[in-house]
Structures are given as C-alpha cells and as structure tokens.
C-alpha cells in the first residue's frame, strides 16, 4: 500500500487549507488516482490496523439495501452511529440507492442486480455502472454519498472496477473504502465466474483533517508490510447470500492501530 502513503505525503506537501462542512478544517488536493492489482494481494492498509469486521459487515449491509443501523449494532459495528437518528435511520443512503433507486413512475431499480446481469450477459457494455448520487433525495440523507459512482469493466476474463469518490477523508475513511470495493470486486467476480483485475480509485476533494496531522505523520513513519490474501470460503447462490463467515483474510500483519477523531 505504498501508493496510499504517497497520497498522504502529497496532501501534506501540496494541500490547500480549506474550511469544510464539519468546521474542522482540512488540507486538500483535488483529483488523484490509484490503481490496485487485486491479483497481487488484498489492498488492506498495513501501516495501521484496520477493523475488517466493520468493512465486511458494512458492505453486506449495503448489499441488503438496509439503511438502519440495527444490523450493524447487532454485529458490534458503530461506524454509522454519529449520523443515525433516534430510531437508527439514516434516510435513503447507499443501500437504498444501490438496491431500490426510485423512478418517477413509482418503480424501483435494483442497480446491483442490474450490473450483475450485465456482467453475465453483456460484459463488454460501457454502461455497467452504479450511482449513489441521487440528486432528488440528497436532502433526505443523513450524509450525502462520498463514494458516489462506480463502473465495472471486463477484459481477458478479469473483472475491474473504478470508483469515483467525491469527498475523501484520507486518514480514517480511505482505507475502509479501498478494502470495501476490493471485496465487492472479489464477490462480483466469483458470482460471474471471472478472475479479479484492478480496483481503480479516483478521488475528488481528497483531504486530511487538521486534527489528523499527528496520526498521519506517525503512519508515514512506518514501513508497509506484505499485503494479505482474501479467501472466500464458499460460493453462495447469489451476491446477496454472502455471510460474514464466508470471508477470511490470510497473512494480515499490520502495525498497531492509530486512533483519530471523526469529523461529523
């Protein structure tokens, strides 16, 4: 994950001081891209410990179309707590847009099922896309989508994916985002009988919060270790039937975790 550390250093070296919605303040750059060959290992940051349980459960929660944090709490995942209302609801966030995008005539589009069908039946299509950026429902969401738009691409029997992330918390959020979409590519590839290719991450406003500087310098002082390997223990009947216990990470030997405050 050397390129992740290089991005952190670039933000420190070239970033512009900006105000932000949370009032915390950031160093920010605009427009950055990283490419991860998923054949070379699972892109889970090793210069600090990442909570893989939260990453897996959040993705499974998205794929169920769920927008209430009850499932996350049942599995000791608290990453969405700060944005939920008193009933645990978040409004029409990722899961709703992925699985039930509303249409003007009252129907709902299951974007995930649609891209699965495209990958199986029309893999050369240039329209294998999922969007969470529903302009008509942004004001109902507890948090507007940060990872907003992703596209799949098949070549030489390998499945690749490119994500556009309009806003990126480099220290806290980005390691989760990279691992989550890499996991999704592995799951999609298994369901479509494809090998994994690349995960391409593209960032818009890519920033370090002003209260993450000490943690960032600590992480940059550490040497990256070998990437772990993802093992999927079984092939479920559908993408929506995976369980937490289906996944195992082999060889993950990270440096200790680094705590940092979340900007709300």
Curated annotation (Swiss-Prot):
Residues bound to (6R)-5,10-methylene-5,6,7,8-tetrahydrofolate are 51, 169, 263
Q: Where does dUMP bind?
A: 21, 126-127, 166-169, 177, 207-209
Q: What is its EC number?
A: 2.1.1.45
Q: Which keywords label this protein?
A: Cytoplasm, Methyltransferase, Nucleotide biosynthesis, Transferase
Annotated active site: 146 (nucleophile)
Subunit-level organization: Homodimer.
What's this protein's family per the entry? Belongs to the thymidylate synthase family. Bacterial-type ThyA subfamily.
Indicate what this protein is called per its UniProt record: Thymidylate synthase
Which organism is the protein's source? Salmonella paratyphi C (strain RKS4594)
